[in-house]
Curated annotation (Swiss-Prot):
Induction details: Positively regulated by WalR. Expressed mainly during exponential growth and rapidly shut off as cells enter the stationary phase.
Organism: Bacillus subtilis (strain 168)
Ribosomal protein in keyword set: no
Biased composition (Basic and acidic residues): 71-95
Pfam families in the cross-refs: Hydrolase_2 (PF07486)
GO molecular function, one term: hydrolase activity
Coiled coil: none
Name recorded for this polypeptide: Uncharacterized protein YkvT
Length: 208
């Protein structure tokens, strides 16, 4: 079989024009050169790719570690103390004086217990929804207390009123749970009279 192909090749070379033979040889050389250059170019691209991204293959199997707080930071967060009752219920001197003046104006002539109860109403309101959360805010809330409207809130409090206010401020157990008080002989508001009465002290009715 090989002998037949060899003979055929010799026959073609003998009868093929010289120009045709040269053209065929040139085409074969050109194709060989093209394949060589292509292989060289691919090798160049592959080398450059590896040099440009050297960490891709090395890092692909690495796992991303979560960020962790330092031991010092974690300890600081865990050791953060909660506020104590004393820290939560701190009052300024200005608030104490204002509460004393309200007690003096609202409970003048009342017993010491009655004065403490009036102060307790103010403090109870600071802890209830619907009221300001400061002593000043509660006392100066619109239409909340008559002494604010008529100016008697500005009178200097007597000693007993100051002591009653201080006892209410320092006591963990309030004299009353009421958030309202009124004098039934002088109160003209029907709404305040509709509130549930919890106790009566002197001339005042205390309600919720």
């Amino acid at each position: 079989m090989t002998t037949k192909f060899t003979a055929l090749a010799v026959f073609l070379l003998c009868f093929m024009p010289a120009a045709k033979i040269e053209h065929t040889q040139a085409s074969l050389l050109s194709a060989k050169k093209t394949k060589h250059e292509e292989a060289k170019w691919l090798t160049h691209i592959d080398r450059n790719t590896n040099e440009s991204f050297p960490s891709l293959s090395a890092d692909k199997d690495k796992k991303i570690k979560p960020i962790k707080l330092s031991a010092h930071t974690e300890k600081k967060e865990k050791d953060k103390p909660d506020k104590t009752n004393d820290e939560k219920e701190t009052y300024t001197q200005s608030e104490k004086e204002l509460l004393s003046r309200l007690v003096h104006a609202e409970a003048k002539g009342e017993s010491y217990k009655g004065k403490v109860a009036v102060a307790s109403v103010v403090l109870n309101r600071t802890e209830k929804k619907g009221f300001p959360d400061t002593i000043r805010g509660v006392i100066y809330q619109k239409n909340a207390f008559e002494p604010v409207a008529n100016g008697s809130i500005n009178q200097k409090p007597d000693k007993e009123s100051i002591e009653a206010a201080e006892e209410a401020l320092s006591s963990k157990n309030r004299e009353t749970d009421a958030i309202f008080f009124y004098n039934p002989k002088t109160a003209s508001d029907n709404w305040i009279r509709s509130r549930k009465i919890v106790e009566k002290i002197g001339r005042h009715v205390f309600a919720v």
